[in-house]
């Protein structure tokens, strides 16, 4: 089964660190260093959120990309899809 949720990627100002948040999933927060690592961490976080916090993740409804882009206009928004 595949699940997909929008992730917010926010670059730290004086660092390679990228903060990652899934606003639709309570507590789903991580970080990565540079784009490739941040994407890996986002996928890993989404899988872990589904497996470890099954009820919260399963009951969450993914927001649309357009809604997220309005709410987080200064950040990068990417729909992350994983097999669970």
Language-model-derived ranges and their functions:
Residues 1-16, 21:
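N-terminal segment of the canonical double-stranded RNA-binding domain
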Residues 1-5, 40, 44-84:
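Short, charged, surface-exposed hinge/linker loops at domain edges
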Residues 12, 23-25, 81-83:
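Generic beta-structure capping elements
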Residues 26-37:
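A short, exposed loop/beta-hairpin motif centered on an aromatic-Gly-Thr core
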């Amino acid at each position: 089964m595949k699940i997909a949720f929008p992730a917010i990627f926010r670059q730290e100002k004086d660092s390679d660190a990228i903060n990652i948040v899934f606003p639709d999933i309570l507590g789903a927060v991580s970080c990565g260093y540079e784009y490739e690592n941040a994407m890996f961490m986002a996928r890993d976080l989404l899988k872990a959120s589904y497996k470890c916090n099954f009820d919260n993740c399963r009951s969450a409804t993914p927001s649309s990309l357009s809604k997220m882009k309005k709410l987080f206009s200064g950040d990068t928004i990417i729909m992350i899809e994983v097999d669970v």
